[in-house]
Amino acid sequence: LTDPIFFKRASPSQLIGPKRRTPPALSIRQLPQIDFIVISHNHYDHLDYHSIRQLLARFPNIVIMVPMGLKRALLKWGAKHVVELDWWDCVTVDGLCFSATPARHWSNRSLFNVNKSLWCGWVVQSNIDNQKQLKTLYFMGDTCYSPELKEIAKRFPSIDLALIPIGAYAPRWYMQSQHIAPKQAVQLYDELNCHCAIAIHWGAFELADEPLDEPAQLLNAYKGNRSFHLIKIGGSQAINRIDSEVE
């Protein structure tokens, strides 16, 4: 799972704050076996206390990957297995290599801990020798556009599937230093040289000024014939590693 949030608000309180506009596709009770969670940073729409607690109750031995500065909090919440990494650090667990990658964002959960923990993306690589299985997955997390992100493509030249955010970008004068917009998402798709991508970070919470469905509309307008897929919440797609076609 990536940055799981199953509750109705992305907020320290379930009484106020950004409210979920689209229900989760599955409840925690309906999930299949989950072995790993990767966390990109500590903002409330990415790191949710109640979701983590309930996931730990169902999957007590789950391994949680976090950027620097978050391990202590996850252990306090009841996690048994937490791995904390700096940018470009990597760890291999059960045949999967997890690498924390740079992002351009920020962190806080109150006025008193701004940028006290790191933010990152994650590259997950499998060493399974199967030509049809995805071998390299890149979860971008939250980031604005930065030319430095090209370094990720240099270090990981064969990204099978990228999870690229497209929402929470308006107004640009304020959000351009925090989140990419759909046009930049397409630019990053090209610069990463990934085989295919799925759009994330849209359609669930109203976090910025754009309408909830605008990110998808703009991505459809910009992406052309690229294998950059939009999946509605509750939908699913099978990705073929060889030709990046949706089956």
Report the location of each language-model feature:
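Conserved beta-strand elements of the Class I
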Residues: 1, 35-38, 99, 123, ...
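Pre-active-site segment of Zn-dependent metallo-hydrolases
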Residues: 1-42, 51-54, 69, 108-114, ...
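Short hydrophobic/aromatic-enriched beta-strand-loop microsegments
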Residues: 2, 63-64, 80-89, 160-165
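Active-site metal-binding loops of divalent metal-dependent hydrolases
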Residues: 4-6, 42, 103-105, 141-143, ...
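Glycine/Thr-rich phosphate-binding loops of Rossmann-like dinucleotide-binding domains
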Residues: 10, 47, 108, 172, ...
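Conserved N-terminal glycine/acidic-rich loop preference
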Residues: 27-34, 40-48, 73-88, 139-140, ...
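Cap/insert and terminal regions of metallo-dependent hydrolase folds
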Residues: 28-31, 36, 51, 63, ...
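Metallo-beta-lactamase
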Residues: 66-135, 218-235, 239-242
